A protein has these predicted regions:
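NTP/phosphate- and nucleic-acid-binding module
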Residues: 2-605
Length: 605
């Protein structure tokens, strides 16, 4: 039998000093840390929560920042299996279950039915939708013994569209709203930040189906309101931003974020109006331009100007973009992509040689002429001489020393005929939506996304219904996600402090933990537990045979919203110590008042 770090051997069975119910399980010595109880009360001696001490070289407070992922590991909510792959332990599963129940509540409010789709998806369906090509590296792919090819689904638009297409044929069967909470898979090149960027994750996906575009947009707005209600129930500050639909398709989408210094997204908001957008979607009009520094006088180009070099995906076009001040502004890749859609973003825009080599060397391979474009931010000054020099170039030396014919053109920095800036937003830039506001940039962690898809999937997947006029129409769809496991990691980081984790009441593994000293009569402990539990407060008793200091530190590490201590005050006057770390409260309350006090304080959490 193995020995553990305290020098004691593991015992199997019930603790004879704490268990009164008859049991076929053999009794254990008094020093055991685990008991098996049968009285229906929640006890940590029954519950496996393998918390850990701070390891040497602990990184949870690295650079003054709290690492929520390290605390999730130490608090016994999860364990890592491999890079980007994690196992949820009992405490973590309780958090996830509560998130899922909260999601169920708000999906039910939309009239959505819950499903559970297979993790295996046919490559044929992804090929039919057009999403298989160019994304090979993102998928976990496999082949069965009959050489049929599958992938582990990162999302289920194709599968759900096929299911509905096979079953729904009339507008009378719509609207339809289906959702699932399942595991998804993506072969991340660089998994990081624990649950925030993993290769296996739990997602809620809601798929909506409507007969017409206006109806689909009404559905979209209803879903947005349900998301707001869900996040409001968590009682945590959140951001909602207009977003890029990316590979999902469609033009209308919103992201839902928690502000976080460790977030991978940047949200641009206004301090006056409700303007809010992901930086990836931000393009500023010229009339809201911040003033650049004055450029140096130069015959050909300003010496302070910043340049960005890019080549088209077919290697036949070269882009030189310039903005007024390299040390002040950063290029906005989204603006460059809107003006020059062929851009290959895999190149480093500052690596002039690599871009030029890719562009000019292709001329010898295909023999086609090359075109180069100059894209100039409208705030650039003193560029006239450079313009003339640019236009005059009709050939350039090739890799083998031969001359390659080129045409040199100048692109206007315009989108839909309106002048725009080529640079990213900065704090205190003027708001493009209102006249008075200033922009504020915040790092954030995305925890949800709503997409209006339109007919992006219904057309290629042939999802059509007969409308009221007896005409075949493609169904208008929406897809709306919440990262369930991602929420756990995001909230852990958001609420953690130097003592440990913190949880909103709605999803805490337990809302309160009752910690009695060993001298407290067991009947008193159970009576107080029943009082709190019967008030619909999710409570557990820490009856493990550990020192009180260890138990209190363990409670802080796990992050229970309320800690109820039965100690010296109980013996003297039947009073308790009530602790709430998030509110910085540690106070004495009478046993009769503990439920009402917890209810009162919980409104502030």
């Amino acid at each position: 039998m193995p020995f553990f770090r305290n020098g004691l051997r593991r015992s199997v069975g019930a603790c004879s000093s704490a268990c009164t119910s008859p049991s076929p399980i053999p009794a254990s010595p008094k020093w055991t840390r685990r008991c098996i109880h049968f009285d229906g009360r929640s006890r940590l001696s029954n519950f496996w929560s393998p918390t850990q001490r701070k390891p040497k070289g602990d990184r949870s407070h690295q650079n003054g920042e709290i690492d929520g992922h390290e605390l999730l590991l130490r608090a016994g909510l999860l364990r890592q299996s491999a890079s980007g792959i994690f196992h949820l332990l009992p405490l973590g599963l309780r958090v996830q279950d509560k998130i899922e129940r909260l999601i169920d509540k708000h999906m039910t409010s939309l009239g959505a039915s819950k499903t559970s789709l297979s993790s295996l998806s046919s490559e044929d369906l992804w090929r039919q939708s057009g999403r298989l090509d160019g994304r090979d590296s993102e998928f976990f792919r496999l082949q069965d013994r009959k050489e049929a090819r599958f992938l582990l689904s990162p999302t289920h638009e194709e599968e759900i569209t096929k299911i509905v297409a096979d079953a729904v044929h009339s507008y009378k069967d719509l609207p339809l709203r289906l959702y699932q909470i399942t595991r998804k898979y993506r072969d991340e090149a660089r998994p990081r930040q624990g649950l925030l960027r993993g290769r296996e994750f739990v997602m809620k996906d809601l798929y909506t189906f409507d007969t017409t575009e206006p109806q689909a947009r009404e559905t979209y707005e209803a879903v947005r309101q349900a998301y707001v209600a869900f996040l409001t129930d968590l009682r945590l500050p959140y951001l909602v931003a207009n977003a890029d639909s990316g590979n999902m398709g469609g033009k209308l989408s919103h992201e839902y974020h928690f502000a976080s210094d460790r977030g991978e997204d940047t949200i641009i908001g206004c301090d006056t109006c409700d303007y809010s957008v992901n930086e990836e979607l931000f393009i500023a009009p010229l009339d809201k331009a911040p003033s650049p520094p004055v450029a140096d006088d130069a015959p050909s180009m300003p010496t302070k100007a910043g340049f960005f070099f890019a080549v088209s995906k077919d290697r036949r076009k070269l882009l030189w973009a310039t903005q007024p001040a390299q040390d002040v502004f950063d290029f906005n890749i989204q603006a460059l992509k809107e003006i020059f859609p062929e851009i290959d973003t895999t190149f480093d825009g500052s690596d002039y040689k690599a871009v030029m080599d890719a562009w000019i060397s292709g001329a010898e391979e295909d023999g086609e002429p090359r075109t180069r474009y100059l894209l100039v931010d409208a705030r650039n000054e003193g560029m006239e001489g450079f313009f003339e020099q640019w236009r005059s170039v009709t050939s350039l030396p090739g890799p083998e020393g031969n001359e390659v014919p080129v045409s040199s053109e100048i692109l206007p920095s315009e989108i839909d005929g309106k002048p725009v800036l080529l640079t990213k937003a900065r704090d205190s830039d003027p708001c493009p939506s209102c006249e008075q506001g200033k922009l504020k940039l915040q790092q954030a962690t995305e925890i949800g996304h709503t997409f209006h898809l339109g007919t992006r999937y219904s057309q290629p997947m042939q999802l059509q219904v007969l409308d009221a006029n007896n005409k075949q129409v493609s169904v208008s769809m929406g897809c709306h996600g919440i990262g369930v496991s991602r929420l756990i990691g995001a909230i852990a980081t958001l609420l953690a402090d130097k003592e440990g984790l913190g949880w909103p009441m709605a999803i805490a593994p337990f809302e309160a933990v009752l910690i009695p000293t060993p001298s407290i009569d067991k009947a008193d402990v159970e009576s107080l537990y029943d009082q709190i539990h019967n008030a619909a407060i999710d409570t557990t008793i820490d009856d493990r045979e550990r020192a009180m200091g260890w138990k209190l530190n363990d409670a802080d590490l796990v992050g229970y919203p309320f800690v109820v201590v039965m100690g010296r005050a109980w013996a003297d006057k039947k009073a308790l110590e009530l602790q709430c770390r998030r509110l910085d409260i540690k106070e004495e309350v009478q046993a009769a008042d503990v439920v009402s006090r917890i209810a009162e304080l919980s409104q502030k959490l």
